[in-house]
Regions:
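Amphipathic alpha-helical scaffolding segments comprising HEAT/armadillo-like alpha-solenoid repeats
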Residues: 278-286, 308-320, 339-350, 373-376
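Short inter-helical turns and helix N-cap capping residues of alpha-solenoid HEAT/ARM repeat scaffolds
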Residues: 291-292, 322-323, 354-355
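Aromatic-Pro/Gly-enriched surface loop or interdomain linker
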Residues: 20-72
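Catalytic beta-strand/loop cores that center a nucleophilic Ser/Cys/Thr
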Residues: 147-221, 229-236
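Extracellular ligand-binding/catalytic regions of CAZymes and related secreted enzymes
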Residues: 23-27, 99, 126, 212, ...
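A glycine-rich, often tryptophan-bearing local segment used as a flexible ligand/cofactor-contacting loop or short
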Residues: 84-163
Length: 376
C-alpha cells in the first residue's frame, strides 16, 4: 500500500514537471509565423493563448527554429493558412527539429492547415505525425461557416463545459477530411465528430465532411499532438478550446475559464456561407470604401450576423471613420466578436474620440473586450 502511494505521488510529480517549465511556471507557447500561415489565423491563435493565465505566447519563424528557439518552448502551434506552403517555408531540417521537439515530451497543436501539415496524406507535403490522412483533397475549397460538432467520451473529459450539449458550433474553413492513415501505424483518439455537411463551393460532393473526425489527438514519442480541422480561435465564445488543446498536449490539468471567455451559446445553429452570401460579402468591401454611414452600419450588422470570415480584415479602420455612428458600430463589432487582436486599436480609438457620447459607448465596448483577458 505504501509503495503504491509513493508511486502515485511520483506520477503526480512527473505530470507537474511536464508543464511547470516556463518562466514563473508559465507554459511557453510558440505560434509559427511563416509564409503559408494566414495573418488573421496567427493573430487569433495568439489571442486564444492569451486567455489562459498559465501560458505565455510568442511567434516563431523558420529562422528561429533553426537557431534553437524550440529549447525555450513547451508547445508549438501551426496555424491555419496553407499547409504545403508552410511545409516549404519550414524546410525539412526544421520539420525534423519539430518532430524531435515533440518526441522529447513537448506538445504540438495543428489548426486546419496545421492539422493538414501533420497528416500522412499521399501527394501532399506533410509531416506524418498525427496518424491521419486527408481524402477528397481535390475539393478542398468546399466552403466555410459556423459548423456543428459533437464530442466523444474522451472529448467530453477535455471540454467538460460542452459535455451536456448534443452539438456545439465553431468556424470551419475548408479543413481536411480525415481518415486513418494506411501507412503510418500511429493510433489517434477522436475527440469530436463533425456533424455538418459542407459542400457549398468547388463542386464538392455531399456527405463528405459530416461524421468525420473534427478533433484528433495522439501520442508521439514522449510528447503529444492535437489536430483540429476547424477554427475555435476564430469563433467568439469558443477561443478557449485552443489553450485547452495545448494543455492536453502537455498533460496539464483542465482548469475553468471565466464565463466571459466560455460562451458556447453565442452560436446554436449552422451558418454556412452560400455563393450568394459570398457575393454579398465581397460587395460590402466597396461599401466600406465608398458607402454612406447608414450603408456601412447595415453592412456591419449583416457581416456580424453571418460571422463573415473576411470582415475582420476590414473593420479595423472603421474605428476611425468620419462618422461617429460608424466608429461606435465598429467598436461594438470588434467587442462582440471577441476580436482581441484589435484591442489596442480600440483603446486608441477611445482615447482620440472627440464625440463624448460616442466615446463613452466605445469605452464600454473596450472594457467588454478587455474582460476576456485574465486578471494580472
Amino acid at each position: 500500500m505504501l509503495r503504491k502511494t509513493f508511486f502515485i505521488i511520483a506520477m503526480c510529480l512527473v505530470g507537474l514537471s511536464a508543464w511547470s517549465m516556463g518562466v514563473g511556471n508559465k507554459v511557453r507557447v510558440g505560434v509559427f509565423q511563416g509564409n503559408g500561415g494566414a495573418q488573421t489565423c496567427i493573430w487569433e491563435t495568439i489571442a486564444s493563448i492569451q486567455l489562459d493565465p498559465d501560458m505565455t505566447v510568442r511567434t516563431i519563424t523558420t529562422g528561429n527554429i533553426a537557431n534553437g528557439v524550440l529549447k525555450d518552448l513547451d508547445a508549438i502551434i501551426i496555424p491555419g493558412g496553407e499547409g504545403a506552403t508552410q511545409y516549404m517555408n519550414l524546410g525539412e531540417e526544421n520539420m525534423e527539429r519539430i518532430r524531435n521537439f515533440i518526441r522529447s515530451g513537448k506538445g504540438a497543436v495543428g489548426i486546419c492547415a496545421g492539422a493538414y501539415l501533420f497528416t500522412d496524406t499521399p501527394g501532399y507535403a506533410c509531416m506524418h505525425i498525427n496518424g491521419g490522412k486527408a481524402i477528397d483533397i481535390e475539393h478542398d475549397n468546399r466552403g466555410h461557416g459556423i459548423s456543428a460538432f459533437s464530442l466523444t467520451a474522451e472529448g467530453k473529459k477535455l471540454f467538460p463545459e460542452l459535455a451536456k450539449r448534443d452539438k456545439s458550433y465553431v468556424m470551419y474553413y475548408e479543413g481536411p477530411v480525415l481518415v486513418k492513415s494506411d501507412n503510418i501505424p500511429l493510433p489517434y483518439t477522436t475527440m469530436a465528430i463533425m456533424e455538418t455537411d459542407v459542400h457549398e463551393e468547388g463542386n464538392a460532393p455531399a456527405n463528405m465532411t459530416n461524421n468525420r473526425p473534427f478533433f484528433i489527438a495522439n501520442e508521439y514519442g514522449k510528447g503529444r499532438v492535437f489536430s483540429s480541422i476547424s477554427h475555435p480561435e476564430a469563433t467568439p465564445g469558443m477561443m478557449w478550446m485552443i489553450p485547452r488543446m495545448v494543455r492536453w498536449t502537455l498533460r496539464m490539468p483542465v482548469v475553468a475559464y471565466s464565463k466571459r471567455v466560455v460562451n458556447p451559446d453565442l452560436y446554436n445553429r449552422e451558418i454556412l456561407m452560400t455563393k450568394d452570401d459570398l457575393r454579398k460579402e465581397r460587395g460590402y468591401y466597396r461599401t466600406f470604401l465608398y458607402g454612406s454611414p447608414k450603408e456601412k452600419i447595415a453592412a456591419l450588422d449583416w457581416l456580424q450576423a453571418c460571422r463573415s470570415w473576411d470582415a475582420k480584415r476590414w473593420v479595423q479602420g472603421l474605428l476611425f471613420d468620419n462618422s461617429p455612428a460608424v466608429r461606435e458600430r465598429a467598436a461594438r463589432f470588434i467587442a462582440e466578436t471577441d476580436y482581441l487582436p484589435f484591442l489596442s486599436d480600440l483603446e486608441t480609438a477611445c482615447r482620440v474620440e472627440r464625440d463624448e457620447q460616442t466615446k463613452q459607448s466605445m469605452m464600454r465596448h473596450f472594457e467588454h473586450l478587455k474582460a476576456l483577458l485574465p486578471h494580472k
